[in-house]
Curated annotation (Swiss-Prot):
Subcellular location: Secreted
Lineage: Eukaryota, Metazoa, Ecdysozoa, Arthropoda, Chelicerata
Name of protein: Venom peptide 8
Record has Transmembrane as a keyword: no
Species annotation: Brotheas amazonicus (Scorpion)
Tissue expression summary: Expressed by the venom gland.
Coiled coil (UniProt feature): none
GO cellular component terms attached to this protein's record: extracellular region
Keywords for the protein's UniProt record, in alphabetical order: Secreted
Length: 13
């Protein structure tokens, strides 16, 4: 789950 959050953040940036 933690990786999913970071993946979304990187996708935005």
């Amino acid at each position: 789950i933690s990786d999913d959050i970071q993946s979304i953040i990187q996708g935005i940036f």
